[in-house]
Amino acid sequence: MENKDAVLALAALAQESRLATYRLLVEAGPGGLAASRIAEALGMPPSSLSFHLKELSNANLVLSRQQGRFVIYAARFDTMNALLEIGRAHV
C-alpha cells in the first residue's frame, strides 16, 4: 500500500462517525448492509451517513453495490489488511 493511500484511509477512520460506520460494516461481514440499516443502527440522519460513506469509499475502505431498490455497503477487508501489514512490517 502506498503511503498516500494509507494516510487517506487512516484519516477517514480518524472521525468518530466514520469509524462507527466502518466498525458496523466489519461486523456485518462481506454481505454488507443497506444504507437505511446503517443509518438506523447508528441513529444518524441519511444525509450525514451519505457524506461519511462517500469519504470511506474515497479512501477505499468500503464498496457499494445496487441490490434492487437498495444500495448495499460493505467493508473492504483488503484495504484494512494492507493497513495492518504496514504496522506488522515495523514491529
Question: What do the predicted segments below correspond to?
Answer:
Residues 89-91:
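Conserved small/polar residues in nucleotide/adenosyl-binding loops
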Residues 60-63:
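A short, conserved structural fragment
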Residues 40, 57-58:
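Alpha-helical residues within the helix-turn-helix
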Residues 4, 9-45, 67-79:
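N-terminal helix-turn-helix DNA-binding core of bacterial DNA-binding proteins
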Residues 53-54:
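Short, hydrophobic-biased segments on the C-terminal half of alpha helices
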